[in-house]
């Protein structure tokens, strides 16, 4: 392990941290020190609060480190570079993927990027290690994790690529051209799943949700129809719409515990695929119905996914934005100026009003 002393006047910085369960505050935290010659330290330029930040603060998951700095969605400026970093320099503006794989573990060679060496090893920023909601934060293996912001790509679009786009597109990777696709949930991830499914050539895309701000954007991204779970029995609607066969792909990006069972109910026998992108909080079970699973013999497939990380993934998404394949910044409904507004942004994402999809905080740093 390599350590680099940093010549800075102040050893503390502003950070938005989980002080105790159900309470997050802006605190004074220790500035990071480079832990490896392959790492960088960054200052966030634009950040966004995610539903999983809300779950970290208000959910019922495992105990978190004391004063855990939150956040995993950021576009940032490089401020300190390890001596073995090749491709990045101080002052570069980069997109920081929410998933930062451990490229030093041999599990990577099995293609196991998200869980190399330990379960959820790529999913640490703001969950088990200090996140991006701070004046400075560290990212490991910069050459393998960061992506330069291309000319012509807005801060907002790059910010939406770091988590929302990569996660939604992960759900859409199982879609073949002409497929009938159901997307359950039209928050940021669901909207990006709709967009990804359309880009992969899906035929009919049935989006399920009721949030007012999301509905027109769902159509913009390629939804054929948007239906509300408040007005319809979704399983019956999908089965009727497909002449009893069910959808080719069902992508779960919202809902409750029952939603998982509903997805099994409405997907095709033999070739149907359910892709889960939702974090199911709390204890208990996600139930697979015996009847619609053919009592275990239906041939339906279930995939439980995280958004993919790493530099190449992020560069590909940013290239799609640069060449106008999609516009993820349409999802930003609330923009703030000043880091202190992260407090209000967390509350907005917790309350999830009808006019809220995603926030962007321009830190001013």
Q: Where do the protein language model's features map onto the residues?
A:
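Residue-level recognition of short, solvent-exposed, well-ordered loop/turn junctions
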Residues: 35-36, 89, 176, 268-269, ...
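Glycine-rich beta-strand-centered segment in the early N-terminal region that forms part
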Residues: 32-47, 60-109, 130, 150-153
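Mid-domain Rossmann-like dinucleotide-binding core that forms the NAD(H)/NADP(H) cofactor-binding site
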Residues: 151-232, 236, 249
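Glycine-rich phosphate-binding loop and adjacent beta-alpha segment
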Residues: 219, 256-326, 362-365
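C-terminal hydrophobic helical "lid"/dimerization subdomain
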Residues: 2-13, 261-265, 310-365
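Short N-terminal strand-loop motif that marks the start
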Residues: 1-75, 135-141, 147, 362-365
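NAD(P)H dinucleotide-binding glycine-rich loop of Rossmann-like/cofactor-binding domains
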Residues: 102-184
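N-terminal Rossmann-like NAD(P) cofactor-binding module of classical short-chain dehydrogenase/reductase
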Residues: 95, 248-251
